Amino acid sequence: MLRLKPALLALLFALGGAAAAADVRVAIVSRTVFYVPLWLAQDKGYLNEEGLRATIEIFDNAEKINADLRSGRSQIAISTPESVVIDAYRGGSLRIIAANAERLPHFIIAKPQIKTLQQLRGARFGVLSLNEGTTYLVHRLAGAIGLKPGDYEVIAVGGAPTRWKLLQEGKIDAGLQPFPLSYEAEAAGFTNFGPISRYVSDYLFTSVNVDSKWAQENRPVVQAFLRALKRGQSEMAARPGEAALIAARELKTAPALAERALADTARLKILSPDLSVSDAALGSTFETVLGVGLLPPGSVYARGRMVDSSYLVP
């Protein structure tokens, strides 16, 4: 990607027009309800109006997203925050610049033969990655219901759509599924043990992430992206029926299920309302990463090491 001096880029954005357009590749993990504001920002032209030509790429792999941020192949990611926290505490350049999902929309879904939580002993849990997201939630769930690490298996298979496919094929026994996939699973006869939020309340599950070296050189681009994302989220709240049609298209589900998912997203306050990162959500994620030994022993929560909120402006 062409790197323009910040002062020149700011001038171009101020002047507007086609000359100001900047190419931005946005990496996301999977097709889940968290990304509806982004899809709306693209579909409604908010990204274009901010002077951005955005390409959205679905990776189904958080580690590859981080590698692409470092290499510059992707400029912005809406992805899992755990590896960003780890990278920051190791002196790396990845940073969280805004929040996305700060509460969990996942339900504990198991194959129909599993009827009780105790029957999850010996189960194969499908997760996105062994070092991200649902992995840590599975461990916290297991501990809460009395299972030890050797009592179950965690397998990295990919995002929620992939997990649903593997559940149906019998290749995994259980997984944490966000809505609307949780609705589809329950309708298909799979066991729904309820929301993971019974065991984990606030948790920064997805965030807007960048390589700080690139972001510092392209501040107007980053700020423009966040403004467009905010507009997409406002659009989702203001016109849920229309947003549900776009959600249904992108999530590859029925419009009625998409509308239900958006209603539940609002009711459960899944998304950060203003994209700001709350200490309650980030702190829970930090404590989880620390607890599984991926940070140096004795590491202390320091928001400024992980988060740069300076890009999030009105």
Identify the residue ranges that each predicted region occupies.
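Sec/Tat signal peptide C-region and signal peptidase I cleavage site
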Residues: G17-A21
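Secondary-structure end/capping motifs
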Residues: E217-P296
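Short, glycine-/small- and polar/acidic-enriched structural segments
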Residues: D23-G150, V154-E169, D173-F179, N192-I196, ...
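N-terminal secretory signal peptides that target proteins for export/translocation
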Residues: M1-R3
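Bacterial N-terminal signal peptides
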Residues: K5-G16
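Extracytoplasmic/secreted envelope proteins and their assembly/folding machinery
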Residues: Y35, K44, N66, P81, ...
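Conserved C-terminal helix/tail region of periplasmic/extracytoplasmic solute-binding proteins
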Residues: E287-P314
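Pocket-lining segment of extracytoplasmic ligand-binding domains
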Residues: E82-S83, P161-L251
